[in-house]
Design a protein with these regions (language model features):
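Ribosome large-subunit tunnel/peptidyl-transferase-proximal elements
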Residues: 1-229
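Intrinsically disordered, low-complexity regulatory segments in nuclear proteins
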Residues: 274-305
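Intrinsic structural disorder
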Residues: 1, 5, 12, 263-266, ...
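Internal, active-site/partner-interface "lid" segment
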Residues: 126-129, 133-138, 223-259
């Protein structure tokens, strides 16, 4: 569902930070200044939200996942609820360094968490250990669950990351940019929109503001999931990993079709700037990006020669 301009106004999306804390790169999203506070242009916010929903829809229809990121305590519950409602993954405790750039190690921790949870169930392996050992494993399980419960179903790198506060989540934003993962983020007047594929200018501190925008993104994911074709289940795709150095190898006994599918080369992710230019429909931006890539190819050819 696309929120109206009136709903954005009532939710306080237009309230920015104090003028002395602003980032000059957010100038194009600022409407005015009132009592030492920047007022955000809601017309541009609404336009950016539409672009964000379009990008989210494209990612989900390709069969890729979306990761919600918000480590602010007062907003974590809201973001988690919206992520669970649309079947997306989420990080609401703290960003683990290397969550994306060192995904193989994180995946091992997720597998360990699943093993500990299975062993703690009735009739599980925990019953064969002493009470002290059970207590230690239970503590380890709780510690892992605190940081990894929202990404237990993540078997590969997400296709898109939705961030609540781009400035606070700068480590996650940096990792996503290194891997070419598109980012949709709520950017307050103190953020750097150049690091985001589709920045949504808005209040990233108010509960109603974040809830309204997160709900719009969640609705876009839910609608796209209903239209998307059936994808392999988590168990079927558990062995395939996006960040594998050797690529995806066919499983033992897999059919010819399955082997051909796994041998397909990985598609190269577009850069955030190219995604933003394509969504905005700016022909000049698209031509500039293509020209830049062509220049790099020519330089590479000259150096080889």
């Amino acid at each position: 569902m696309q929120p109206s301009l009136q709903q954005l106004l009532e939710a306080g999306v237009h309230f920015g930070h104090q003028t002395r804390r602003w980032n000059p790169k957010m100038r194009r999203f600022i409407f005015a200044e009132r009592n030492g506070i920047h007022i955000i242009d809601l017309q541009k916010t609404l336009r950016q939200l539409e672009l964000a929903q379009k990008l989210v829809r494209e990612v989900v229809l390709r069969g890729e996942s979306v990761l919600f990121v918000c480590t602010k305590r007062q907003l974590a519950a809201i973001v988690q609820a919206e992520a669970e409602r649309c079947g997306a993954m989420y990080v609401t405790e703290r960003w683990l360094g290397g969550l994306l750039t060192n995904f193989q190690t994180v995946k091992k921790q997720v597998r360990k968490l699943k093993d500990l949870e299975a062993g703690s169930e009735a009739g599980g392996e925990f019953e064969n250990y002493t009470k002290k050992e059970q207590l230690l494993m239970s503590r380890q399980r709780d510690k892992l669950a605190k940081n990894l419960s929202g990404i237990k179903s993540m078997t590969r790198i997400p296709g898109l990351m939705f961030v609540i506060d781009a400035k606070k989540e700068r480590i996650g934003v940096s990792e996503a940019n290194k891997l070419g993962i598109p980012i949709v983020a709520i950017c307050d007047t103190n953020s750097d929109p150049d690091l985001i594929s589709v920045p949504i200018a808005g209040n990233d501190d108010a509960i109603r503001s974040v809830e309204l925008i997160a709900r719009a993104i969640s609705d876009a994911i839910s609608e796209a999931r209903r239209e998307a074709p059936t994808r392999p289940t988590e168990e079927e795709g558990e062995e395939s990993t996006y960040s594998s150095d050797r690529g995806m190898e066919p499983a033992a006994g897999a059919g010819e079709d399955e082997r051909r599918r796994r041998r397909r080369p990985r598609r190269r992710r577009a850069k955030p700037e190219a995604i933003a230019a394509r969504l905005k429909g700016g022909a000049e931006g698209a031509e500039g990006a293509e020209a830049g890539e062509g220049g790099e190819v020519e330089e590479a050819g000259e150096s080889e020669g």
